[in-house]
């Protein structure tokens, strides 16, 4: 997911 849905972890926005 390249979206910034995980605003809490902006550092890991591209986790997948």
From Swiss-Prot:
- Could you give a GO molecular-function term held by this entry? carbohydrate binding
UniProt note on tissues of expression: Hemolymph.
Q: Which UniProt keywords apply?
A: Lectin, Secreted
What is one term from the GO cellular component aspect held by the record? extracellular region
The coiled-coil segments of this chain are: none
**Cysteines engaged in disulfide bonds, as pairs:** none
Induction comment from the UniProt entry of this chain: By infection.
Give a yes or no for keyword Zinc in this entry.
no
**Superkingdom, taxonomy of origin:** Eukaryota
Keyword Nuclease assigned to the entry: answer is no
Annotated compartments: Secreted
Q: What is its main location?
A: secreted
What this protein is reported to do is described as:
Binds and precipitates antigens of the parasite Echinostoma paraensei.
What protein is this chain from?
Hemolymph 65 kDa lectin BG06
